[in-house]
């Protein structure tokens, strides 16, 4: 009997060591939490305490579809969920606990899908967004009172490592639907990406303004859901950027007058709208996972003044980026844009992110490709 106990103890210790060697705690886990864990093949293990639950199901965003999971409830009230290999990159996720959407208490929360949401990072083997031993910039919070939306608007500003030494160009950068101004900082790792690019002399140092992508007045907030709210919001945003935000930034921060604009998903539409409407103000327009709103088959650019680019003297450089595994509708928007630009011999570049979905690894890579092309 004693011999059996020793063998059992050795087996348990051995299993623990194998588990710890093959799996590492996700970078999104809270400090001192051991889960979720990810192995070298992208398989994940979640352990959550829902003692009264009868059903716990793992759910998530684009990169977590079609997952195979093994779910087991233990006598101590913990549920263990093991998955098949996940796609690389950052994924939003949550648990369906007896029909109720519930975040993982083990992870940091990220604003996605219109609410605080759990996240997991599946390593891609890249380090361009890692926190390296380089000179660091900083991100500050700021705000202004808008006469367009009749309220306070918050935004974040990235200041480059050598901010105190001279004046800098400015990139205005937008998040996507269901996200907010924290997206580029938390999920996007913008600070690490730019710090590393600047340290390697691969991009011109710049200020980045991460503005809020919703711009509706209190009255417009009451518009029905089937109303083209995004177009209304974008037209308001156009006024805010040109009449309020830019003058504010140029007065308060050390800017040199050069500007570019970019965004992801809905933010791509906003960047294209504002950039196309004011081509004289921007040297480049970046569209990451492009979206076009309220277009028709005959008039795909009905609510996007992209034809103004053709008449402009400055002709801002146009950048398009998309994930290889994104939904076909995003490729449809992308193709409409590349066809238009090619037919009109307008300068642009196309980037495709290998193996990624409509998610943050795509957009991190887009920024990494886009930033070195700016302010040359």
Task: Describe each model-derived feature in a short phrase.
Residues 1-22:
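Bacterial Sec-dependent N-terminal signal peptides
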Residues 33-38:
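Short beta-strand segments of immunoglobulin-like
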Residues 20-32:
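A general sequence property marking short-to-moderate contiguous segments
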């Amino acid at each position: 009997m004693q011999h059996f106990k020793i063998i059992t103890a050795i087996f348990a210790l051995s299993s623990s060591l194998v588990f710890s060697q093959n799996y590492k705690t996700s970078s999104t886990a809270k400090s001192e939490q051991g889960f979720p864990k990810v192995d070298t093949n992208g398989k994940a293990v979640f352990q959550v305490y829902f003692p009264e639950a009868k059903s716990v199901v793992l759910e998530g965003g684009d990169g977590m579809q079609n997952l195979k999971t093994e779910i087991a409830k233990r006598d101590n009230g913990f549920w263990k969920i093991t998955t098949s290999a996940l796609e690389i990159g950052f994924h939003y996720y949550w648990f369906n606990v007896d029909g109720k959407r519930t975040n993982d208490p083990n992870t940091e929360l990220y604003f996605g899908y219109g609410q605080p949401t759990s996240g997991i990072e599946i390593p891609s083997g890249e380090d361009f967004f890692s926190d390296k031993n380089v000179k660091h910039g900083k991100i500050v919070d700021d705000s202004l009172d808008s006469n367009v939306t009749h309220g306070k608007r918050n935004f974040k500003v990235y200041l480059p490592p050598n901010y105190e030494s001279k004046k800098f160009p400015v990139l205005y950068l937008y998040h996507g639907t269901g996200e907010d101004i924290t997206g580029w900082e938390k999920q996007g790792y913008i600070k690490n990406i730019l710090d590393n690019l600047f340290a390697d002399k691969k991009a011109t140092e710049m200020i980045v303004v991460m503005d809020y992508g919703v711009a509706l007045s209190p009255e417009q907030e009451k518009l029905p859901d089937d109303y083209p709210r995004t177009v209304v919001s974008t037209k308001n945003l156009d006024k805010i950027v040109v009449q309020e935000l830019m003058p504010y930034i140029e007065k308060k921060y050390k800017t040199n007058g050069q500007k570019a604009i970019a965004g992801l998903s809905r933010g791509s539409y906003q960047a294209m709208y504002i950039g196309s409407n004011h081509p004289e103000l921007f040297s480049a327009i970046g569209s990451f996972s492009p979206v076009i709103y309220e277009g028709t088959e005959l008039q795909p650019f009905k609510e996007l003044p992209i034809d103004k680019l053709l008449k402009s003297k400055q002709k801002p450089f146009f950048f398009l980026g998309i994930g290889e595994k994104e939904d076909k509708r995003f490729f449809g928007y992308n193709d409409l844009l590349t066809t238009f630009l090619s037919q009109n011999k307008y300068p642009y570049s196309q980037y495709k992110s290998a193996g990624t979905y409509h998610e943050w690894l795509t957009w991190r890579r887009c920024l990494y490709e886009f930033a070195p092309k700016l302010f040359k």
